[in-house]
């Protein structure tokens, strides 16, 4: 079975780097390109059409909605399945994105594991043109509270962990898991590290080394 080809588009380079690392770690996914503005998205789509496009709503030059309009005009075949990302849950924008072909609309911050699940779902379900009709703005996904995500980011920055190193992503996941289940602190090497390793398709020892 061939891997799901994913194109990432977001103007936050740090976020894109984390997203690329996580998706690339999935056994059935491959990141074929990244774009930091709307024009780059259109150019990359002209060169190669991905199975799934992860598209941020707010970007320079062309915003996410303008990119969706461009995609419609390009008449790509096959059409990529599109997951929209945004930090704002405005209903009118959500409706417009769905009308223009978005299959899912996800609010930041979100759990990357859930995003991976959504990618698999839209690939294995009906074509996007049919699937979009069942998507409603009210179903916008908010996985984690913004305050929690902001607090975790602040903590990691205070510790001095650079965002580009591999341990950064593992550390974020560890803090989130412990926040949701403090008892994990009593079984860090036996449960916490192995659970993180499963999510990133690596080993517990690798997770431990990267965090340390």
Curated annotation (Swiss-Prot):
Free-text remark on how the cofactor is bound: Binds 1 Ca(2+) ion per subunit.
GO molecular function terms noted in the UniProt entry: calcium ion binding; DNA binding; DNA-binding transcription factor activity
SUPFAM superfamilies, per database record: C-terminal effector domain of the bipartite response regulators, CheY-like
InterPro entries linked: CheY-like_superfamily, Sig_transdc_resp-reg_C-effctor, Sig_transdc_resp-reg_receiver, Spo0A_C, Spore_0_A, ST_Response_Regulator, WH-like_DNA-bd_sf
GO biological process: detection of stimulus; phosphorelay signal transduction system; regulation of sporulation resulting in formation of a cellular spore; sporulation resulting in formation of a cellular spore
Pfam families reported for this sequence: Response_reg, Spo0A_C
Amino-acid positions noted as binding Ca(2+) in the UniProt annotation, renumbered to this chain: 10-11, 56
Keyword terms: Activator, Calcium, Cytoplasm, DNA-binding, Metal-binding, Phosphoprotein, Repressor, Sporulation, Transcription, Transcription regulation, Two-component regulatory system
Main location class: cytoplasm
PTM statement from Swiss-Prot or TrEMBL: Phosphorylated by KinA and KinB.
Localization (cell): Cytoplasm
The name this protein goes by in its record: Stage 0 sporulation protein A
The organism of origin for this protein: Brevibacillus parabrevis
Taxonomic classification: Bacteria, Bacillati, Bacillota, Bacilli, Bacillales
């Amino acid at each position: 079975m061939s891997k799901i080809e994913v194109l990432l588009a977001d103007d936050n380079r740090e976020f894109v780097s984390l997203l690329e690392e996580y998706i690339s770690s999935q056994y059935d996914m491959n990141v074929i390109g990244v774009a930091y503005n709307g024009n780059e998205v259109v150019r990359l789509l002209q060169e190669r059409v991905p199975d799934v496009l992860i598209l941020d709503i707010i970007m320079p030059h062309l915003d996410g909605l303008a990119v969706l309009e461009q995609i419609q005009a390009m008449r790509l075949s096959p059409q990529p399945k599109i997951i929209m990302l945004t930090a704002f849950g405005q209903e009118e924008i959500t409706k417009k994105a769905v009308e223009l072909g978005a299959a899912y609309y996800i609010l930041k911050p979100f759990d990357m594991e859930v995003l991976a699940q959504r990618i698999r779902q839209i690939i294995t379900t009906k074509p996007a043109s049919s699937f979009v009709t069942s998507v409603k703005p009210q179903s916008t996904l908010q996985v984690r509270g913004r305050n929690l995500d902001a607090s975790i980011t602040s903590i990691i920055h205070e510790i001095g962990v650079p965002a580009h190193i591999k341990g950064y992503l593992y550390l974020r996941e560890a803090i989130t898991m412990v926040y949701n289940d403090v008892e994990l602190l009593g079984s860090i090497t036996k449960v916490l590290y192995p659970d993180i390793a499963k999510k990133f398709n690596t080993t517990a020892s690798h997770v431990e080394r990267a965090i340390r």
